[in-house]
């Protein structure tokens, strides 16, 4: 859920941790879609009357919407808050350096944990698309490609671990005297 995740991320960056949030288009917002869209459209109407180019700026990409939500939870006009915001990176989809990294979820922000099964919710990706984000289709195709690659990579990893286990089993009898010595000195546990 958008707000809960943003609150946890805001705390983490204030504590000095670097945080990267990927697949922002998959974030959920509680409340039905139509209500959330009306809220966002009301936000779009807020502008400087004499010169709208001076702000407030309305970001359309899910990653930027999330980034702005986090910014609202930080003292972003102070040096400390600015430094915290620089420690946060947000992305739509999972771009190359992070597609091979281990990712984690925040259980306290999961929809299944926090919302009753009957409650309505909206997807940030769909909301963004309907208020002017142009890259929903591209992001979706790139995600499909990434998932295919990840599947292949995982299959390869599984075979490698299987082979290494087999190799360990094969040489177990020949290196047993060495392992006994290593265990004696506490190198192997």
From Swiss-Prot:
Matches recorded under CDD domains: Ribosomal_L13 (cd00392)
GO MF annotation terms: mRNA binding; structural constituent of ribosome
Keyword entries, A-Z: Ribonucleoprotein, Ribosomal protein
Pfam name, any one: Ribosomal_L13
Gene3D superfamilies cross-referenced by the UniProt entry: 6.10.250.3250, Ribosomal protein L13
One example of a Gene Ontology biological process annotation: translation
Superkingdom, natural source: Eukaryota
Transmembrane segments: none
InterPro entries xref list: Ribosomal_uL13, Ribosomal_uL13_CS, Ribosomal_uL13_euk/arc, Ribosomal_uL13_sf
GO CC annotations, alphabetized: cytosolic large ribosomal subunit
PANTHER family: LARGE RIBOSOMAL SUBUNIT PROTEIN UL13, RIBOSOMAL PROTEIN L13
NCBIfam families: L13_A_E
Family indicated by similarity: Belongs to the universal ribosomal protein uL13 family.
Name of the molecule in the record: Large ribosomal subunit protein uL13
Organism listed in the record: Salmo trutta (Brown trout)
